[in-house]
Design a protein with these regions (language model features):
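Non-catalytic accessory regions flanking glycosidase/transglycosidase catalytic cores in CAZymes
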Residues: 2-231, 236-245, 267-271, 275-308, ...
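Active-site His/acidic residue clusters
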Residues: 249-265
Length: 502
């Protein structure tokens, strides 16, 4: 909740550990790996690199992903998925076919596939989230992949997996039934009725093969699609009993409009998107007279600035490799705040992508660069545990062209009863004004500041480079003491602050 105060007043944040929203799903801190550009090849997989392990996986990339505490990784796409035959990526590498990959107009070598992905997930301690092809693929090919991954030996595709050196099932729990099938750009694009019927039948077969799995339905690719939200309504009504999540996607950027105040208020758009989808879920549940629940999976989200997206038929082309500035990091931080504020309906989220492609990690042969956006994700994934809290905020308003008057502070919070710790995450959107803020703690009152971090600067375009890799990075700060359940802190203009109290 929010109320307005005058600009010269001290902002107030009220937190009561008894005013909770929902349990925070660990799967909110997921990532996405697609066969696009250099995400897989030269990203996570680079056997020629001295920085790779014996399996060809980049050790520095995996260390960075472990640092960010990724809980799940979605694979193999993305638009790539809708033209992908999963059989191309299993078995002896010397027999795997080279293909013209149509989604990104690249050459796919298939040297990295399902089993290599499973090994990668184990090494970073993340749960695999597989996707099945609903473009050129069939409901049978979807069921076959589930059998390959999850069935015990004794049938065709489980035995095939065993012959490839993996006798034990991978036991993949989460399965996306297609990707962005509402988009005309998608290979094998279907209309809403065609997709819904195909997805329902695919999910039935997949769950018959492996009854414990959870399935993700393709929702709208973004909130500006002409079929939004009718696509979602039709797909949900048709498939409700067979699906566990509705996928939503969104990207944003400030490179075209160059409207920084509105860009720094992007959480308004993000939150509206979730609210519309939550209402659609409630409607579909009522319409189907069901006791079954379906939640949201925001399994593609990121700042995406303009850049090349066609590979001109080369291997591992440099596609969509754009740097991320301080203002981009503050937008990412707001996205994460929305995840906590909507934890009652949003249970899965996967940032696109984990390295090189529209990513806050970039590789080259001799190292790894972290952009500013790396830090809000890392801090929240490490601090936010337990339940999300319903923060009450009193702060000034800032004027924006797209969203009208917006609170200058964007806030989310968490409370973990097991460790008796509170996490607080604050964005100061102001381009010019620092904000003195009182954090008022109620309930199980914290007494100490265990961690305090800030990412701040005076230039919204400040960006890390290979020459200056720490130009925009989160730094530990000395926070004032908590006195009588209150912590007063100064929030610089253009800043992100993460606190862990205990």
């Amino acid at each position: 909740m929010f109320t307005c105060i005058m600009p010269n007043q001290t902002a107030q944040i009220y937190l009561d550990v008894n005013r909770t929203i929902a349990n925070i799903s660990p799967l909110l801190f997921g990532g996405f790996v697609e066969h696009m550009g250099r995400c897989v090849y030269e990203g996570i997989y680079d056997p020629a690199s001295p920085l790779s392990d014996e399996a060809g996986l980049r050790k520095d990339v995996m260390a960075a992903l472990r640092e960010q505490k990724y809980t799940t990784i979605r694979y193999p796409g993305g638009n790539f998925l809708s033209g992908y035959n999963w059989l191309d990526g299993v078995g002896p590498k010397e027999t795997r076919p080279r293909r013209r990959e149509l989604a990104w107009q690249s050459i796919e070598t298939n040297q990295f596939g399902t089993n290599e992905f499973m090994d990668f997930c184990k090494k970073i301690d993340a749960e695999p989230m597989m996707a099945v092809n609903m473009g050129t693929g069939t409901i049978q090919s979807a069921a076959d992949l589930v059998e390959y991954c999850n069935a015990p030996v004794g049938t065709q595709f489980a035995d095939l997996r065993a012959s490839h050196g993996y006798k034990d099932p991978h036991n993949v729990k989460y399965w996306c039934v297609g990707n962005e099938m509402d988009g005309p750009w998608q290979i094998g694009h279907l209309d809403m009725h065609e997709y819904a019927n195909k997805a329902r039948e695919a999910a039935k077969m997949m769950k018959w093969i492996s009854p414990g799995i959870q399935t993700v339905l393709c929702g709208s690719s973004n909130d500006r699609m002409p079929t939004f939200p009718e696509w979602d309504r039709v797909a949900l009504e048709t498939t409700w009993e067979h699906m566990d999540y509705l996928s939503i996607h969104m990207y944003t950027s400030n490179h075209i409009e160059r409207d920084t105040p509105s860009y720094l208020s992007s959480a308004v758009r993000f939150e509206n998107f979730v609210d519309t989808m939550a209402a659609t879920l409630r409607y579909a549940k009522a319409k189907t007279r069901s006791k079954h629940d379906v939640y949201l999976s925001w399994d593609e989200w990121q700042v995406w600035h303009p850049g090349p997206t066609r590979g001109e038929w080369t291997e591992a082309p440099h596609l969509a490799e754009v740097g991320y500035s301080l203002e981009d990091a503050l937008v990412v931080a707001q996205w994460l705040n929305v995840f906590l504020r909507k934890a009652d309906v949003l249970k899965v989220a996967c940032v696109a992508q984990v390295v090189n492609i529209i990513s806050w990690l970039q590789t080259r042969s001799d190292g790894l660069l972290k952009y500013a956006s790396f830090y809000p994700f890392k801090l929240m994934a490490n601090i936010a545990k337990g339940k999300s809290l319903d923060a009450y905020v009193r702060a000034p308003l800032t004027e924006t062209k797209q969203f009208g008057d917006v609170p200058v502070l964007d806030v989310s919070a968490s409370y973990d009863e097991a460790s008796q710790t509170t996490g607080i995450f604050i964005v100061n959107r102001s381009l010019t004004d620092a904000m003195t803020t009182d954090i008022n703690l109620q309930g199980a009152t914290a007494t100490t500041v265990q961690e305090a971090w800030q990412l701040a600067g005076t230039d919204p375009d400040l960006m890390n480079t290979w020459e200056k890799p720490n130009a925009s990075a989160a730094k530990a700060i000395k926070a004032p003491a908590i006195t009588d359940g209150k912590l007063r802190i100064k929030l610089p203009a253009l800043s992100y602050t993460a606190l862990k109290l205990g």
